């Protein structure tokens, strides 16, 4: 249920968050969904994580991921986030949530019955001195332009969280410079941060040179 990925970064996979709003064919975490318990990362409680972090004070960054942790109700998510806010874990300065909820279900932050409690949890992280970020997956600019999506991003940021955006290159979806330039500029306009291209799955990938050729004109039109 836990992976010490880099010197400063630990990935944590809470069991209730090992599903998604939808399943992406390009996902490199396919092992979470195929029913093979020997391959799957999953942790029912956060006690093991807290003990590990107390022993490894070089870790400053915890990424809660899956699956998608925001399929969990806020009361369940709290069981995994609140222990990271407690005294004694001052070395942990960054808490990140890997999620596609802002694109697939922006109402999670707006009209869901526990949306306000979710935003209060973000505020509590800020009050505890943590940098809290949503690692949001957007694959096309249209995912950013619905009224619910725009309100969700505003509410997340008003609660003190940062939104960093990532996406893979997908054929017939965003494999041209216009899509990327539009997406990056829309993210900036809405206060989010274009962050990275996701890499990992080999099936269905675009040719590397094609992707690079498309990124250069998109970058030239990016207005940070």
List the model feature ranges, each with a label.
Residues 11-16, 48-51:
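Short, charged beta->alpha transition segments
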Residues 1-12:
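N-terminal [4Fe-4S]-dependent radical SAM core
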Residues 29-39:
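Iron-sulfur (Fe-S) cluster-binding segments and ferredoxin-like electron-carrier domains
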Residues 11-13, 63-66:
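Short glycine-rich or small-residue beta-strand-to-loop segments that form or flank ligand, phosphate
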Residues 14-15, 19-31:
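Local cysteine-cluster metal-coordination motifs and their immediate loop/turn environment
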Residues 40-44:
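Chitinase-like catalytic core of GlcNAc-active glycosidases
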């Amino acid at each position: 249920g836990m992976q010490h990925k880099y010197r400063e970064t630990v990935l944590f996979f809470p069991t209730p968050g090992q599903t998604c709003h939808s399943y992406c064919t390009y996902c490199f975490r396919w092992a979470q969904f195929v029913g093979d318990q020997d391959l799957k990362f999953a942790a029912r409680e956060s006690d093991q994580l807290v003990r590990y972090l107390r022993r490894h004070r070089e870790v400053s960054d915890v990424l809660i991921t899956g699956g998608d942790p925001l399929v969990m109700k806020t009361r369940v998510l709290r069981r995994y986030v609140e222990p990271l806010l407690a005294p004694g874990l001052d070395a942990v300065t960054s808490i990140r949530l890997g999620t596609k909820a802002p694109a697939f279900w922006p109402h999670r932050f707006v009209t869901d019955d526990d949306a306000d409690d979710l935003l209060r949890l973000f505020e509590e992280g800020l009050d505890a001195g943590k940098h809290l970020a949503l690692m949001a997956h957007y694959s096309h600019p249209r995912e950013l332009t619905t009224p619910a999506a725009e309100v969700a991003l505003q509410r997340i940021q008003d609660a003190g969280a940062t939104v960093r955006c990532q996406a893979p290159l997908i054929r017939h979806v965003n494999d041209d410079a216009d899509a990327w330039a539009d997406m990056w500029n829309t993210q900036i306009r809405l206060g989010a941060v274009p962050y990275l291209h996701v890499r990992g799955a080999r099936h269905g990938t675009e040719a590397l040179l094609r992707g690079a050729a498309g990124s250069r004109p998109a970058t030239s039109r990016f207005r940070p």
